Amino acid sequence: GAGEALNAKRQQDVNHLLDLIYDHLHY
């Protein structure tokens, strides 16, 4: 449903932000 799609999009956004944060932590 729409809720599931929204949750999936939010999870992707969170994962992307975590990737950026980890990249910065390595420097």
Swiss-Prot record:
What are the recorded GO MF terms, alphabetically?
oxygen carrier activity
The subcellular location is: Secreted, Extracellular space
Q: Which domain of life is it from?
A: Eukaryota
Which body tissues produce this protein?
Hemolymph.
Q: Which UniProt keywords apply?
A: Copper, Oxygen transport, Secreted, Transport
Function, in words: Hemocyanins are copper-containing oxygen carriers occurring freely dissolved in the hemolymph of many mollusks and arthropods.
Please report the name of this protein according to its UniProt entry.
Hemocyanin subunit 5
Q: Supply the source organism for this entry.
A: Homarus americanus
